[in-house]
Amino acid sequence: MQNQKFIKVIKNNDTATYINIDHVAMFYVGKDEETTIVNFKNGEKMSIKEQVDCFADRISM
């Protein structure tokens, strides 16, 4: 097992999703302050309109 850094995204129905921080170039709050914009290293963008817990630790199997 190896310790990796993830961004933890809490969805409105209290389920969580994890994005591997190694794939993320940067992220920032959007204009409406409820949206988080994630820029990936491969050039893709993702807009998250949910609560984001940045740099959450998670053990990856």
Residue ranges and their predicted role:
Residues 1-18, 23-61:
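Acidic, Ser/Thr- and proline-rich intrinsically disordered linker/docking segments
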